[in-house]
Amino acid sequence: MSEVITQEYTEDGKVLRRIRSFVRREGRLTKGQEAAMKECWPTMGIDYQPELLDWQQVFGNDNPVVLEIGFGMGASLVEMAKNAPEKNFLGIEVHSPGVGACLASAREAGVTNLRVMCHDAVEVFAHMIPDNSLHTLQLFFPDPWHKKRHHKRRIVQLEFAEMVRQKLIIGSGVFHMATDWENYAEHMVEVMNQAPGFANLATDGDYIPRPDERPLTKFEQRGHRLGHGVWDIKYQRTA
């Protein structure tokens, strides 16, 4: 896949059009990333195939599954997996050097509760993630597509929210988003408030303080020093 595709639907559920969400960015792997891919992929990598995953088979236990879309270089995902051995983590990233870097970090940290995929997240969701099975879905700092004419390319749209809803555990599953673009934060809230079957978990306004489980990234620390804001948003599946 060269790009992530989302679909726009008519009211009766027919596909109206398919929209690019973000373009896959291929790059050269460093020798270290390439070595990590070769060494760690057999135990931590999951190849795309159009059949549902069995979490017990994937992780060897029935611990709650946290899925992250677009983990970048994987530093915070590995840290989360290390800090929460009682949970299982699956990261999906289309940028292969990022996957290599994540595997190298995971190997160094000695985590065993992390699996990764290098594929289009929407396609993985459609064909591999069982309904009603995710404890948490994480979407941290997705491409904001800040130009207004590109807003339709943002991954958080109504059809994406519905796909997420189907995969989260009913009554407890949480969709956790974070962005450093205020306009995208507003867009996320607007979309999620329209999406059926979700409730905002914020107790004051639309946003929550950064939860302890989401590590502070270097990028975010720099943003704080420059006075930039970060917005965390959590919605729970209710129906």
Swiss-Prot record:
The active site is at D143. The keyword rRNA-binding does not apply. It is an enzyme of class 2 (transferase). SUPFAM superfamilies: S-adenosyl-L-methionine-dependent methyltransferases. GO terms for cellular component: tRNA methyltransferase complex. Belongs to the class I-like SAM-binding methyltransferase superfamily. TrmB family. This is tRNA (guanine-N(7)-)-methyltransferase. It comes from Vibrio cholerae serotype O1 (strain ATCC 39541 / Classical Ogawa 395 / O395). The lineage of its organism: Bacteria, Pseudomonadati, Pseudomonadota, Gammaproteobacteria, Vibrionales. The gene is trmB.
